């Protein structure tokens, strides 16, 4: 694999020499940073099992190497890397896998280690969604996830990835993560704080990542991280699990932040060692039981992961002074909810008791039941999935609901050919050789739902959302 030139400030190199253990050597670190990052993917087990995914992609000649800490994660090598971007493959478009850096799969693995099965989880810095979607898959779309993102421009990307992966148990918020400790104290069974950081571990992906690096900047970032972890710890219920992670390498933003929390609440913070998370953790394990992953250790991005438990209640923070505003939704009455469920089932959409229908004007939504305790405490950017819009003739089912709820085994499902599926993703109507019988057609490809179409004569009218329509080279170009 070709080398690339990484910019290293002298002060950074001095800091790394002091932070790095005696083995592996500092020269190994520098050499690893000059190598481009290996590509990696995570199979979305909400859509397909790992075994079925491997069978489906076997004809492509992809070399998939298992990632030790994530059984659904793989490093991927392709002979035709330049021929077709991974994001333009049919399997990616239908949400069967997520392009995710291997080391960024570590925090969620730690969150669910030792049989931990949380029902209400918060991801405090969630965009673009790799860890939120990984959490949802581990929860099998059950329970509730609050996914927060401070950057307004990234909330849209976060929602797009959640929708593509068929996730229904997520509520999105757009807040500074420092508000949650006061706003929702002791509300979450588990919290992931993948904290904003100096990004020292990502130089293999971005050789210029350290162009604006300085020790002073690290100190400012660490101060923010301490405020964030304090807020997260307040929002964690007694006995709950908090995972703190970064993609940086210095101790000030990593070990020191966790040690500060323990010094602040000495009787309430218990470090949970990660030595048994996967074979080979001893290469990255700190004396506190954290994982401090330098790039050369597992040939991935640099990363830090710590896991801790809240063992004692701590003093509450002052109640926030902001106003949430009126909640614009109302729960659907039981009788009408039954009618909606029956109508949805007729086009192949089904859901379990974890989701409950709510209404806003002519819009119908499905919210995870576990989020109801948070209504009135935070303002949501988006909640659950939009199921339908009502009109005089019935319901106009929404694309995100089809992706999350549809069963490809429904009697109105219609499997497209590769050429027809590509036309669908390009936003064009499809003219199948043998038209389906039903008027409302659940369009599938590779036995996966990709949309809902109206049959008009011999034509399937495309309903693929305009913002998702693709141009350029797609999967049949690589056939």
Swiss-Prot record:
| A GO CC term attached to the entry | cytoplasm
Which Enzyme Commission number(s) are on file for it?
Answer: 2.1.1.178
Instruction: Name the reaction it catalyses.
Output: cytidine(1407) in 16S rRNA + S-adenosyl-L-methionine = 5-methylcytidine(1407) in 16S rRNA + S-adenosyl-L-homocysteine + H(+)
Q: Which residues form the signal peptide?
A: none
Q: Which Gene3D superfamilies match?
A: 3.10.450.720, Vaccinia Virus protein VP39
* UniProt similarity note: Belongs to the class I-like SAM-binding methyltransferase superfamily. RsmB/NOP family.
Q: Which GO terms describe its molecular function?
A: RNA binding; rRNA (cytosine-C5-)-methyltransferase activity
Q: Which organism is it from?
A: Shigella dysenteriae serotype 1 (strain Sd197)
Q: What does this protein do?
A: Specifically methylates the cytosine at position 1407 (m5C1407) of 16S rRNA.
Q: What is the lineage of its organism?
A: Bacteria, Pseudomonadati, Pseudomonadota, Gammaproteobacteria, Enterobacterales
The domain of life for this entry's organism is Bacteria
Q: What is this protein called?
A: Ribosomal RNA small subunit methyltransferase F
Give binding positions for S-adenosyl-L-methionine: 125-131, 149, 176, 194
Supply the alphabetized keyword list.
Answer: Cytoplasm, Methyltransferase, RNA-binding, rRNA processing, S-adenosyl-L-methionine, Transferase
> Which processes are annotated in GO (biological process)?
rRNA base methylation
What NCBIfam families does its record include? nop2p (TIGR00446), PRK11933.1 (NF008898)
Which compartments is it annotated to reside in?
Answer: Cytoplasm
Where in the sequence is the active site? Answer: 247
Q: Does the keyword Cell membrane apply?
A: no
């Amino acid at each position: 694999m070709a080398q690339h030139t990484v910019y290293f400030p002298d002060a950074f190199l001095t800091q790394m020499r002091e932070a790095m253990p005696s083995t592996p050597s500092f020269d190994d670190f520098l050499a690893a940073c000059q190598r481009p990052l290996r590509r990696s993917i995570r199979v979305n087990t909400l859509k397909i099992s790992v075994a079925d995914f491997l069978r489906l992609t076997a004809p492509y000649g992809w070399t998939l190497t298992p990632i030790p800490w994530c059984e659904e994660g793989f490093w991927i090598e392709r002979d035709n890397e330049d021929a077709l971007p991974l994001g333009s493959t049919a399997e990616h478009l239908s949400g069967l896998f997520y392009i995710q850096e291997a080391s960024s799969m570590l925090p969620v693995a730690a969150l669910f280690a030792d049989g931990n099965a949380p029902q209400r989880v918060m991801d405090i810095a969630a965009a673009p969604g790799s860890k939120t979607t990984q959490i949802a898959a581990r929860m099998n779309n059950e329970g509730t996830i609050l996914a927060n993102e401070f950057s307004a421009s990234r909330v849209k990307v976060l929602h797009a990835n959640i929708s593509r992966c068929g996730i229904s148990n997520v509520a999105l918020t757009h807040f500074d993560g420092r508000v949650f400790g006061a706003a929702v104290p002791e509300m979450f069974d588990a919290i992931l704080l993948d904290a904003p950081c100096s990004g020292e571990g990502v130089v293999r992906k971005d050789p210029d990542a350290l162009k604006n690096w300085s020790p002073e900047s690290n100190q400012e970032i660490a101060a923010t991280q301490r405020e964030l972890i304090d807020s997260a710890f307040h929002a964690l219920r007694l006995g709950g699990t908090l995972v703190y992670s970064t993609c940086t390498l210095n101790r000030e933003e990593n070990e020191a932040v966790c040690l500060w929390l323990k010094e602040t609440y000495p009787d309430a913070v218990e470090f949970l060692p990660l030595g048994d998370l996967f074979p080979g953790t001893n290469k990255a394990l700190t004396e506190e039981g954290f994982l401090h992953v330098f790039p050369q250790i597992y040939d991935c991005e640099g990363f830090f992961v710590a896991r801790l438990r809240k063992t004692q209640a701590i003093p509450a923070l002052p109640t926030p002074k902001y106003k949430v505003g009126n909640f614009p939704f109302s729960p659907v009455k039981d009788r009408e909810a039954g009618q909606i469920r029956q109508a949805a089932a007729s086009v192949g959409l089904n859901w379990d008791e974890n989701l409950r229908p709510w209404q806003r004007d002519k819009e119908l939504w499905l919210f995870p039941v576990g989020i109801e305790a948070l209504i009135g405490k935070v303002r949501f950017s988006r909640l659950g999935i939009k199921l339908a819009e009502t009109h005089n003739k019935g319901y106009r089912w929404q694309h995100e609901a089809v992706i999350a709820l549809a069963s490809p085994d429904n009697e109105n499902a219609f499997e497209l050919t590769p050429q027809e599926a590509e036309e669908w993703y390009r936003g064009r109507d499809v003219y199948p050789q043998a038209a389906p019988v039903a008027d409302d057609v659940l369009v599938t490809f590779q036995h996966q739902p990709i949309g809902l179409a109206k049959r008009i004569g011999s034509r399937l009218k495309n309903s693929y959302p305009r913002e998702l329509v693709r141009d350029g080279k797609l999967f049949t170009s690589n056939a």
